[in-house]
Amino acid sequence: IEGSINNYLLSNDEKFLYVITSEWNEEFKNIESKDSEPMYYENLPFRFDTRGIIYNKRGNVYKVNLQTGKSEKVVNGDKHNIISIDSLVENNGVLTFSYDKHNSKGTMLEERIGYLKNKKIVDIFTKGMMGNLFYYEDELHAVGLRNRFEWPTNTTILKFSQSGKVSFKYRLFDRNIVKAEVHESILYFLYEDSGKTLLRNGNEKIDLIDQNITIKDFAFSNGNTYVIANSFSSPDEVYELIEGELNKISKANDSFVQNVRTRDCIYERIDTGKSEIDTWGIFVGKDKPTILNIHGGPASQYGFTFFDEFQTYASAGFNVIACNPRGSTG
């Protein structure tokens, strides 16, 4: 393909692989020097997106026969004008996916959830911002917002009925959920809490770990739990999670850690009288200049995560302060 593979899904019978791609659209494929070709607009989109249109890309899904290696395009992004495809699930032989396309006026991206029926896309939901589709207790779920740009509402787990009606899985859970997965009938999810990103057992409502870290992904194998995690002073590594503790099993950044000095943070939650502000600081000396980083939010946050800019500032002799005055997403 002339593009990139964004995601993939093994079919339930393990005979096929569904591959999500981002490729040049049909019209743009014929241009020899793609990098120098300008874009022409008759009207300016309300919001420039980075998902495809300004790069002339379209999202497709291929079905690959694992035995023969042959493939067929089952979702044609050019035909349906799909800018990108985020998540894909299979249930009872039906493919359901979340995807982006522009509205009828061409002024705004719409995120939709639809399923494939006789090579046609039947939309289930069209108003929100959703991805990370999964089935739990034989019902379709997604992580996201019911309405686009519904900030500062937290992203959460939403449940869909067959008619497309949406309800909250955890209505009273007031933290930002970023990823969910079902393993052995248990629903696990990552959520943000005051600068941390932690892993939670949704069935039992308990955290598998409570440390000042950011967990970026998780997986299960042979009864073991694995996470990709980092902290304020340590970059990403793979860890096995054992009784609430991290056991490092990868060496991806060992050389970096051995050769580059990193600094841990001082954390304070500052009460202004009207709200509480999560704040992190690196102190290198009282006679040193200070850089204040204020997060615009509320769609993201500074936190207990490895950020090379802060480490670079500190190495150059600056004190560093980073805060979330509009609220951490967790």
What is each of the regions a protein language model found here?
Residues N65-G69, L116-K119, S161-G164, G202-E204, ...:
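Short loop/turn segments that connect beta-strands within beta-propeller blades
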